[in-house]
Curated annotation (Swiss-Prot):
Belongs to the UPF0276 family. It comes from Acaryochloris marina (strain MBIC 11017). Gene3D superfamilies: Divalent-metal-dependent TIM barrel enzymes. The lineage of its organism: Bacteria, Bacillati, Cyanobacteriota, Cyanophyceae, Acaryochloridales. It comes from the Bacteria. This is UPF0276 protein AM1_3026. It holds the Pfam family MbnB_TglH_ChrH.
């Protein structure tokens, strides 16, 4: 089994359409991200993940922790996640700064939080509980919400920066989401990046968006757009060569297309790696 001490370079999101290609051809990709919720039930998906895990470093990324929900933490889900993490030994475990459940009922979306001091403390406590249960720090990912709460007392980046310190967790920085939010809500994305603590950024996501009537939607169904590539390069200038993932979740293309996107990201990463 490949040692799971760290990752570097540009990885690709693991999708079932590409299991056979990866296992047969063993492409030169430095690491892969698996959607943890897809493997909690065991069976054939977990079998494939274990086969791939034997060859590649893996990170686990989920959508169901519901860190911002008023519901109690779902201990059944956390137990399954811990069992998966203990079995796969991922480099990182991550989820979103969001809520996805009400009164025990889950819905198929990631809802944003009010950015207030009280919510900050509440979510920080829940993250701390999750980390204690899992026995590891987690990464939280920033969203691309299309609505904002009127009573926000903090900007998203102020909220995130404070949360990372209070919860003692790390950030999975989704550059596409920052770009989409900046365009839709009218802020300078560099203000966002400049507010984040450099030492807390452990992974970056890149994806494609869709534009409709001058509004951007984070669909993960297109190549990374030029403006996102530019913002990504600016992020690397601030944070250094942070391991980066190409996400593609709808209209999933051939593995070669994803490899080309990852190679483009790695070209930029190489420009910020220390020279021997």
């Amino acid at each position: 089994m490949v040692a799971m001490t760290a990752i570097q370079g540009a990885g690709i999101g693991l999708r079932s359409q590409h299991y056979a290609h990866i296992l047969t051809h063993q492409p030169a990709i430095p690491w892969l991200e698996a959607l943890s919720d897809n493997y909690l039930g065991g069976g054939l998906p977990l079998y494939h993940l274990e086969q791939i895990r034997a060859q590649y470093p893996i990170t686990l990324h989920g959508v169901s922790l519901s860190l911002g929900s008023a519901d109690p933490l779902n201990m059944d889900y956390l137990t399954q996640l811990k069992q998966l993490a203990d079995r796969i030994e991922p480099v990182h475990v991550s989820d979103h700064l969001a809520w996805v459940s009400v009164n025990g009922h889950y819905f198929n979306d990631l809802a944003p939080l009010p950015y207030t001091e009280s919510v900050l403390h509440y979510v920080a406590d829940r993250i701390s509980q999750v980390q204690e249960f899992l026995g590891r720090r987690i990464l939280i990912e920033n969203l691309s919400p299309y609505l904002q709460f009127r009573h926000n007392s903090l900007t998203e980046w102020q909220f995130l920066a404070a949360l990372l310190v209070e919860a003692d967790c790390h950030l999975l920085l989704d550059i596409n989401n920052v770009y989409v939010n900046a365009t839709n809500h009218g802020f300078d994305p560099l203000d966002y990046l400049d507010a984040l603590p450099v030492d807390r950024i452990k992974e970056i996501h890149l994806a494609g968006y869709e534009e409709q009537d001058h509004f951007l939607f984070d669909t993960h169904g297109y190549p990374v757009q030029p403006g996102v590539w530019t913002l990504y390069q600016q992020a690397l200038q601030r944070f250094g060569p942070v391991p980066t993932l190409i996400e593609w979740d709808t209209d999933i293309p051939s593995f070669d297309v994803l490899m080309a996107e990852a190679q483009q990201a790695d070209t930029y990463l190489c420009q910020h790696r220390p020279q021997n």
